[in-house]
């Protein structure tokens, strides 16, 4: 190879823009004829702009531009979280999600199991003196690194832990369902407001890209008006000893655990509140798993816009998590809608004389990292969370209406949460920015 054509690393760095026309000995006319104009930042090394590293789009018009590189905050500037409760969800999903978070970090643990907490702390580099028992809120309060707590205990313990966190002056991210009753949820909202701390309910699907795209498409009117919605979330359950089958700890069975995703998902999709609810509950007899809680629930909601939503949930079926939106000129089918991962969206609509079925390709993101970063951003910018306590309170009220409708066999009249008004998304904070 001729020395004139050998590109060294020094030449590449000196050229700044990578394989520019100058480096290849090409004139300006040749460059213009062979491709798009030179980018405003170096093609291969990128540049720092507004505190971020940016690269120009290196693909041609036939492909979508790649996303920008991640821009995590320095660890010392991220919001420190204490995880309260070290069960399956914390250990399998939430703690690993901090590795993908950009604005949040885990700095403390609270658990009733000292051995488990000690081992987990060692695995995640958490100091031994930042590990607490459930009766050590005063010690946690004194830890300045803890700005927020994530409550991941059984549902029946949410109220007490949220009140303790608020009393400690810590912002609160609480798992769903918010509580065991609307009265408890109301108390939690009031306690956090009085303490001047933020309260967010962990409705992860409202932050997940595919669910957000369904909401965007449904509300855009691109495929006409939404007329009907179907939502189903079901799975089998075993181990009669687990806390989810004990009413005092769970508050109910399939409905508050997994059926809540259908209820909240439809509300978030439409941005309005139902006006009436009908429901049925079926629980197998002589099954010791369901001595205290229900197995299967079907409920129908009618909305002011005329939309009818048919929802179902069960602890007795093969895993299925589906959301389907029917509009006047199309349909949106979200497979694995409420799962931790694996979402797939199909959009059907008329295209001339035939039906077109599209599958938008979106970037899958860790839902727990997304909600952690949203809470962190709300703390850093003093912003109301998208899914605040009022969002969880309204769901508690509506679930009580579902149980009442099933018990009486009669429709139950419902409406907006008191004090929130009649507007769209009345129980929610500001809309999420696109791409976040």
Q: What kind of feature is each model-predicted range?
A:
Residues 105, 356-360, 378-395:
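Glycine- and charged-residue-rich phosphate/anionic-cofactor binding loop of Rossmann-like
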Residues 83, 174, 199-201, 311, ...:
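Hydrophobic residues in well-ordered beta-strands that form the structural core
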Residues 187-205, 224-228:
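Rossmann-fold dehydrogenase core element
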Residues 45-72, 264-341, 369-383, 399-401, ...:
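Contiguous beta-strand/loop segments that form the cofactor/metal-binding neighborhood of enzyme cores
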Residues 90, 205-291, 409:
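Predominantly a Rossmann-like dinucleotide-binding segment in NAD(P)-dependent oxidoreductases
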Residues 129-191:
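Beta-loop-alpha module in the N-terminal Rossmann-like domain of NAD(P)-dependent dehydrogenases
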Residues 2-20:
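N-terminal secretory signal peptides and thylakoid transit peptides that target proteins
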Residues 35-125, 435:
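N-terminal Rossmann-like dinucleotide-binding module
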């Amino acid at each position: 190879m001729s020395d004139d054509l050998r590109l060294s690393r020094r030449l590449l760095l000196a050229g700044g823009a990578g394989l520019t026309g100058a480096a290849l000995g090409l004139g300006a006319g040749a460059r213009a004829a062979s491709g798009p104009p030179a980018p405003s930042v170096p093609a291969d090394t990128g540049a720092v702009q507004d505190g971020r590293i940016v690269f120009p789009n290196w693909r041609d018009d036939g492909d979508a531009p790649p996303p920008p590189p991640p821009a995590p905050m320095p660890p010392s500037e991220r919001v420190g979280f204490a995880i309260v409760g070290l069960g399956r969800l914390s250990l399998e999903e939430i703690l690993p999600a901090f590795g993908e978070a950009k604005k949040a970090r885990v700095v403390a643990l609270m658990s009733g199991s000292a051995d488990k907490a000690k081992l987990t702390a060692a695995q995640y580099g958490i100091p031994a003196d930042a590990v607490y028992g459930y009766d050590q809120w005063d010690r946690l309060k004194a830890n300045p690194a803890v700005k927020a707590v994530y409550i991941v205990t059984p549902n029946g313990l949410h109220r007490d832990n949220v009140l303790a966190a608020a009393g400690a002056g810590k912002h609160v991210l609480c798992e769903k369902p918010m509580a065991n009753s609307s009265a408890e949820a109301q108390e939690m909202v009031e306690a956090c407001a009085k303490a001047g701390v933020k309260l967010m309910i962990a409705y992860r699907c409202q932050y997940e890209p595919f669910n957000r795209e369904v909401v965007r498409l449904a509300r855009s009117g691109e495929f006409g008006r939404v007329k009907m919605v179907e939502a189903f979330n079901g799975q089998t359950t075993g181990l009669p000893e687990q806390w989810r089958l004990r009413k005092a700890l769970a508050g109910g069975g399939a409905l508050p655990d997994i059926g809540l995703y259908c209820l909240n998902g439809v509300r978030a999709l439409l941005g309005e509140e139902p006006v009436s609810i009908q429901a049925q509950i079926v629980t197998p007899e002589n099954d010791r798993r369901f001595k205290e809680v229900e197995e299967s629930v079907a409920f129908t909601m009618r909305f002011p816009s005329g939309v009818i939503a048919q929802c179902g949930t069960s602890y007795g079926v093969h895993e299925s998590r589906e959301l389907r939106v029917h509009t006047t000129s199309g349909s949106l089918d979200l497979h694995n809608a409420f799962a931790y991962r694996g979402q797939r969206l199909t959009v059907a609509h008329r295209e001339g004389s035939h039906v077109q079925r599209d599958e938008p390709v979106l970037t899958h993101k860790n839902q727990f990292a997304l909600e952690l970063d949203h809470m962190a951003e709300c703390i850093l910018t003093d912003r109301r969370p998208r899914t605040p306590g009022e969002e969880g309170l309204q769901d508690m009220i509506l679930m009580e209406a579902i149980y009442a409708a099933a018990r009486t066999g009669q429709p139950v009249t419902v409406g907006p949460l008191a004090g929130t008004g009649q507007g769209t998304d009345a129980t929610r904070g500001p809309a999420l920015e696109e791409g976040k």
